[in-house]
Structure formats: C-alpha cells, structure tokens
Amino acid sequence: MLIVTPKQMGRIEDRSEKLGVSKKQLMENAGKALAGAIDEYCRKDISIPEEEKSIVFLAGKGNNGGDCFAAANILVYRGYKITIINVGGQPSTELAKEMFLRLPKERIEFIDGYRSESVEAAIEAAELDYMTIPQPKELDDLARKKDRNPLDNILLQEKRRMSLVKSAIICAYVVVDGVYGTGFRDQLDKNIAGIFAIGTSAYRIAVDVPSGGNSFTGTVAFGAFEADETVTFGFMKTGMTQYPMRKYCGKMTVADIGIPAGALDVLDSDRKYYRIERNHLASFPPRRERDAYKGTFGNVLVIAGSSSMRGAAALAALGALRSGAGLVKVASVEKCIDTLSVLVPEATYLEMDCDDYGFMLFDSSKDALQKAMDSATAIVIGCGMGVTPDTMEITRFVLANAKCPVVVDADGINCIASDIDILLGKRSDVVITPHVGEMARLLNCENSMIRNNRIVAAEKYAEKYGITVVLKGAGTLIANGRMTASNHTGNAGMAVGGCGDILAGIIGSIIAQGCSVYDSACAGVYIHGLAGDAAAQKLGMESMLPRDIVDCLSDSFRLLKEKHGKKA
C-alpha cells in the first residue's frame, strides 16, 4: 500500500487540480467518505433511532473543519442530530468558509468552542479547566452575584460556554475530531486539549489524522485526540504507521476521494513510502521444483554466538532454516557449537578459536572463515557474538571481503558503531537491523532522538552509506535511501530477547534464495511478524517465546501461499 508524507499529499492535491479534479471536489468527496463512515457506525445499533443519535463535530478553522462541514451537511439530512463546536474559531480558508455557508443553520446546533487570548489568561489565573466546571446551580449563583467585577463576568461567560461544550460531548453518540490536519507540528492549545480530555462513551472518529499527531514522524503532542477510528483521505500518511500516533488512530480507514491516477506522477522522483502487504510478497516463497536440491535454496553463513550467548546463534540458524535456506553453516566457538549441534543438527559448523572469555578470535580462524564466506550466498553476523577487538576485526573483515550480501545484527552493529565509515568500503550489499538503542549508538545520539525521528534516522543512514536499514520496533521501518516501507505485523509478545536473532536469520535466508536485498528485508520483517502473531494467537503474548516464533514460521508461509494461490 502506497503511503505519503504530508508534503507529498499536498503536491498530489495540487496536481489533481491541474488534471481537472478541484480541491473543492476533493473536499466534497472527503465529506462524503467521512459521512459514510459515521453513518456506517451509527447504523450498527438499530435500537436507537437516528434522530436520537447526536453527532458532535469538533471543527477547526482550516480545511479539516471544512471536511467536517461537508460531512455534517450530508448527515443532517439523514436525520441525525448535529452539533458543531467551532474549536479553532471561525473558518479561515476559502474552502472551509464555502462548506460552512452551505450548512442549514436552522437544523444544526452551534456551540462556540473558541477561547481568545484574553479569556485564556483569565482562565489560567482562575485555574479553571474542563474537569472543574461548576454545575448549573453554581452558575446561577454566580450570575446573581451583585458585586461581580469584569474578570468575574469573563469567568461566568467562559464557565457557561465550557458547560455547553462538555454537556454536548458527554451526550454524544459520535464525536468527530476535525481540529488539526497534516500540518500540525506544535503543542496543543490548552483549551483544545481540555476539550479532547472530556470523558465520554461516544465513538471517536478523527478526520484524516488525529489532532495533535505529527503525520510525518508519528509523534504526538500531550493531550492529542485518541480516536477509535481515523478516516484518512487518499492515502495513509507516514506518521500513521509509527507509534505512538498509530495507537491514537485506532482503526484506520483509507477513503478514496477521487484523486486521478495521473496525480501520482509528482512522486516519480521522490522517495517512495509503502506499508508492506501480502501482495508485495507474491514472489516469495519461491516455487520448489521437484528436481531442486539443497544448493538451489542458498547457503547461509551465520557468524554468531559465544560461550555465554549460545542461544542467539541457535535462533538465527533456526530462523534461516525454517525460512527455506538449503544450507546453513554456523561459525562460532567450541562451547557454542557443542550446544547448537544438539539444538540445530540440520546446520553444519565452523569452529573458531576463542579467548579466555569465550569470544571468537580472528587471526587463527581467518583463512577458514574466508573459505566459508566464499561459498555462502548470504552472511548473517553479530547475534550473541560479543564486542571485543577480535569480533570487531571479524566484522570489518566480513564487510570488506564478503562477495555476497551481509546482514549485520546485534553485536555486529555494536562492533562498527565506533567506526561506522567502514560501511563506505563494503564490498557487497549490506542490511543492518538495529533497534532504537543500537541506532542511537550508530548515530551517537540519545535514544529519544531516534524514537522521535525514526523515519528520518533510517532514511538518512541508508542513503549516506548505501545500505538497507531495518529499524526495528513497533512499525518496523525498512529503508534503502530510495524507498521506505513500514510493517504492521507483529505484537508486543515479541518484545523479548532473541526475536531479533530470528529476524536476522530469516532475512539472510530469503537473500540466499535469490530475492533482492531490499525485498528480502521487507519480506523477512513481514513474515517474522506474521509468525509472531500466530504464536500470540496460540499461546498469548505473555507466554510466547522466540522459539515459538520459529515454530510458527510454517504458519506464515502457509498463509502466504494461500493468499497467492500457490501449492504447498
């Protein structure tokens, strides 16, 4: 599925207008789509008549407010009770003004939800918020107060307004957020955050994106609107694939608003963004012909493990084997191999000399390692390997001499963190699979910098070094400098040590079987998450282990084959 940045969406709309589909038509279509989603939800409960289902629109002053007005104009004629709270003040764009003027004012309740700067100052001084609004009797008592000063009058008026706003939202069947759109980048106004915080059992729908969310990065401001459903127009926005904004979107509905196909031409020279779907994996797994042999499906060399971290090597090897690799060889130390030969008898082994602490040595194993590298069609390095001068040298040697693609994970990433420019001298394609902490070490920055700019971090690093970056986490990103994909499979049960080792093995296996490096990374991430979802369904997120993900890889491949009509 194609996704776009906010800037790309703006250019697409501009191009649509030149192709004969005006922005007014796009807004009208957006209004129809929004009204359709609201109507669909409301009609699920037939025990309550339409006229008793109150729909409250929180309308901003920009085009998101215009979308609300367009939808309200449809729904009011379907019998719903419509209330519009103008949270951002009067409409400020020409399109929003036009949609507002079309509304049948006599059939709609309007509530002033806007607060001026002078009123804002008075409210702050009085420490008044939506959680402490006086009850009607208290308001009457204040109104009868004889010695009111000008500030008292402001507060009384504001308390009445806030009471109306709160009452409308509490009594609503559906609350629609159309305050801010894709251009939001700041902090939420306290008045607006207070309105969003009003407790209600209503179904909450966001227009295009939830207000308070950064639709490019996926970060959210304090007090952002948390929706049950987001109706986004034309295309999903990049920030909607990333947490925490993805959580704030709820169910995501992508509405067709009539953008002509030719409008996408403006993206021809742009970096492309996608959400990985099953149809992207139509070429994988490859068909297994009856006359195939083990060499047909690639040879994966896994350089991993140490005396104290044997499981990482085992999981990487199992991930590769369960993903269809014909041959898997593990290069590791003796104690690790002794364990793996029992856990993974299907693999072959290259014993590396080790130091007194059980980590691999380089010089004495260099020739044997080079020979193993020469016969491999993909290399996975780093899982449980440790960070020592020798493992750092091994990593540098592999990157400089490998003739096949290399997947660098875990300690392999940590081994190059102090000398990242070694990637500029790589001999073949490279995939790195960092989590946020490892990415921060690579870029020498705080973890928060990566969390708040995941897309930019992955793209810039991939572009600078000419590699594929798999930035792990909820909404894993796969970037190669020209394309960036996001993944939506997987779950919180996978937040446990060992899952990343399996992923590295899966990606290495798919590369070894002949898929392109970028496509292999995308497929590997998707399949890994799909297996995690299968494990969670069987065992629950709390009880599943990484080994269960390995066992469920067969479920992933079965689902892919069923989707594409392939024979097992």
Language model features with spans:
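Small-residue (G/A/S/T)-rich helix-start motifs and N-terminal tracts that mark the onset
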Residues: 1-97, 121, 128, 170, ...
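Internal gly/pro-rich beta-alpha loop/helix module
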Residues: 173-174, 179-269
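Nucleotide and nucleotide-moiety/phosphate-recognizing core
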Residues: 36-179, 189-207
